[in-house]
């Protein structure tokens, strides 16, 4: 967690990591009594057992890694000092947040968020988020927590989109539409670094205009609603979101789309499988190699326009949830129903906050997954500079690909949202 350096691990007297002592009881101070069971479970601490200092420090790191506590300390008490007491200080999750982002595509965007954490019998959390910019949205989230790592959540989001779609570097269509999104989900993070989420969604796409700039009007689009079911699994050990220095991220998403809970347009539903993998391999103290793989496959007949594969930009999900990043293509382009992307990012850190990145990536896409290796190949790359400021990342890059003829330029100031 990026917050781990702000937490304190405290013990009452100096000891060696290999020292072993007997623990008769494990006690907690400063937490809700209902959380003791799962906290004992994930920490691995057991009563009436032998414990090394190293194992104790690992258990405390796990507690800190939940990101629920601002301070964690321990002490040994009792006549023989056999009672282990862990004292924690819970974080307050009620907050008001403001974000500001400047970039060369959207120009400026403002994000406002208010979160209220209600620590009643059943922990619940309510938040309201709004974004102002070329892409505007309002979102309301409500979650009930069975324990801090398991929750049932209900969300509603309204988005106004003004999207430009490109093909081989040329804009082919501009579309404006309103997107209504409702989600009911269950999240389970009881496994260390692993999150599982299951649920159902309703989405309605209310298209306002669909303006082609080319003669080929390939996509026939009308307002349409979808009922979908999804499962997501995410393994995350990256030490921070931006400029990670170690760890891996592996994410798998599978969604089934219908228009009546069961079928789509009178035939079998269509579905989408998405996989993303990123690893950070330190070569020296300042030089790292970041290999990544992204892929998405649409399965079934007549996949709907709002869920087609789109590629482009320097980060995933920039404009649409299914968007895959590709260095050398700045704008969003529609690809075939099966897409795979391999990327290598060689990143050099200069000093503490400056980074130079050299990225090469290769994509292949084809409508039929079993013919993917016969599909169209796309090559691209970029060179970029970034500064990790206290206000968020500031980065710029220049890119090229065989999908367009022009040098691509992108500038970003601040966290992306």
Identify what each model region corresponds to:
Residues 1-7, 13-14, 156-159:
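Post-signal-peptide, soluble extracytosolic/periplasmic N-terminal scaffold domains
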Residues 12-20, 85-92:
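Conserved "repeat-terminator" motif of extracellular CCP/Sushi domains
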Residues 33, 49-242, 311-325, 332-340, ...:
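Gram-negative/organellar outer-membrane beta-barrel architecture
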Residues 34-48:
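N-terminal periplasmic "start-of-domain" segments of outer-membrane beta-barrel proteins
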Residues 36, 40, 56-60, 274:
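Extracytoplasmic/secreted envelope proteins and their assembly/folding machinery
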Residues 65, 95-98, 226-350:
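C-terminal outer-membrane beta-barrel translocator/porin domains of Gram-negative envelope proteins
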Residues 85-89, 347-378:
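C-terminal hydrophobic structural anchor segments
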Residues 192-194, 285-287, 352-354:
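Secondary-structure transition into beta-strands, especially the periplasmic turns and strand N-termini
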